[in-house]
Amino acid sequence: MVEEIKNFKIETAHNHINLYQQCGRLELLSNDNELQSLIDLEKPHKLGLRNLEHLMSVLLFIPRPDRILMLGTAAGSLLHFLRHYYPQSEITAVDIDVELVEKMLQIEVLPPVGNGLTYVYDDAAHFISASTQCYDLVLVDVFSGAQSPAWLLEKSCTNGLYQILGEHGAVAFNLLIDSEHKFKLFYRDLRLVFQRQTLCLPVKGLENTIAFGIRHPLTARDMAWYMDHAMEMSEQLEIDFLQILSVIYNTNPVGAGVI
């Protein structure tokens, strides 16, 4: 990653982005000044936003993923994280905004193509419906303005995501939904499609909601096992998974699905 990046704006047909570098960090803000992504320029693999740390807690519930699909790239903090901690995994990053991705690659903010990483320029909904591949982990980080797009909340999309998961795969959603009713409908459909193998969790201090759908029923584990597993994963990935696990248990009823 380049050491010096001047502050500038990127305007495309899909995004109006402000990029600022300060205090060794790169901040990506929307046109209305909302923080969308944050990268530590010295340690780009270290996640700087709480919602992304919560999103990656899906790793507590699945085997090590060999094939990863990421829908939406933003400034690439998740891609840097995945490339650093899962160097042997094949990662496909899908984004509709060719101009933005090419610019971010040019200034070396996004990790380059190669070593298992591929960029695909496509609409995420189309990619899901047309995919013939199966993935161990699908990360959904797609927005329309400051909200999750309507198509993403439809049951047909949830069905499509279920179909492209491998036997022990999972999908993790980073959601911004301004209506509790809309979220309840989405989560009801998620639980139906994934046969109750789901989790959801709020992100303290942020409006994001994280939701997981896991394709295959997990082996029954008690809280003590998950606490030990969370401590082990915390050391490996530099994320406080114990704190996030506490949120998961406080939000989701035990015996009603995954936990």
Name the predicted role of every residue range.
Residues 80, 149, 182-183, 222:
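Short glycine-/acidic-enriched loop or helix-start segments at secondary-structure transitions
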Residues 34-37, 143-146, 171:
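A short, flexible beta-alpha/helix-coil linker loop
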Residues 88, 114-116, 168, 195-197, ...:
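A generic structural signal for alpha->beta connector loops
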Residues 2-27, 35-42, 59, 209-259:
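SAM/dcSAM-binding transferase cores
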Residues 155-220:
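C-terminal substrate-binding/active-site "lid" region of AdoMet-derived donor-dependent transferases
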Residues 46-167, 206:
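The AdoMet/dcAdoMet-binding core of the Class I SAM-like
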